[in-house]
Amino acid sequence: MNPDFTGKWKANIENSRLLGPAPKELLITISHSEPDLRVNMAITTVDQNTRYIDFQARTTGESATNSVLDAAWRSRLRWMGSELLIESWANQSEHELHFCDYWTLSSDRRVLTMEHRNDDLHGQITVLDRVDVDC
């Protein structure tokens, strides 16, 4: 049985390894009812600007296109054992980008880890703590 990532999550910036400037806050709301996944992010920078990202796709491996930061991102989601791989391609600021973001959920369902491997953000790990009460 695959993990259910549904919940409200807050990035633990101190426990994460982020490439580039760290945000002041990263909040993520996930709605996951297999095979549908919907992600809403609110990224607040240190100068208090907040950007919102909405993303939706299916975990069946079919391609989905979302508008992310004013660019079309093509993504494919698939299960790799108990990890969810979100593979995305985008052309951002005239650069072709490739991302392989592996999601894992702790056994107590309180910590979501998003780890980039073998991609343009290789080595970045975002650790998120559950902030909703029901899990």
Describe each region flagged by the PLM.
Residues M1-C135:
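Hydrophobic small-molecule pocket/channel-lining residues, especially in calycin-type beta-barrels
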